[in-house]
Amino acid sequence: MHGYIGHTDYGWWRYLSARPGIHEVNFWRPGGRRFAALSPGEPFFFRLNSPINRIGGFGLFARYASLPVWRAWEVFGPANGVDDERALLERLGRLARRQVGPGDLVGCVAVSECVLFEADEWVNVPATFRPQNLSGAVIDLRIGDGHRLWGECLERAAAVPRFEWVAEASDRLRRGQPQMVMPRLGQGSFRLRCSMPTPAPVR
């Protein structure tokens, strides 16, 4: 079993951590870059960018699609980590260093069953992880620092009542048998599954 450590913008994390009712998020990728690092149910860890460089939470990978920005906003809304479509376009434009329009593609990584930790619960990034990796990196959760990371994240998630699956996942980890958990699909993942890229509407 593997997980993925994704470089996470602190503003995105702060926005979503202030909204505990959002359980599924869009970890978007500028330019529609494909994401094929995980299978559904494997953990996606949110590594807060430098100077923080710690794990601020995690969720379970649900699915990926490349969509026009306007459609990504329709599908996920505030789960994109911003208040409105204009703010999403501005955030994407800053990262891409160019103007981004509603019809431009954005990669949508749907992450379900999310828990974002308080600052005093942040988890240390594995020593083998190299922040200079462009977008993130896969880590083996069966051994070493990956095993430690998954265990510490499960400990923190155990305090969240809606995570019924945590007890079984923790037990399997203690027995040296980490196992994927099939994520409960939220509205975003359901809409993502039904989405086909279409031209941007006339505005």
Give the ranges of each region predicted by the language model.
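Short, well-structured hydrophobic secondary-structure segments
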Residues: 38-66
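Short, surface-exposed loop/turn motifs that are enriched in glycine and acidic residues
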Residues: 177-184, 188-192
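N-terminal short leaders/motifs
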Residues: 1-10, 57-68, 192
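Compositionally biased, charged N-terminal/linker segments
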Residues: 1-40, 48-52, 115-116, 121-133, ...
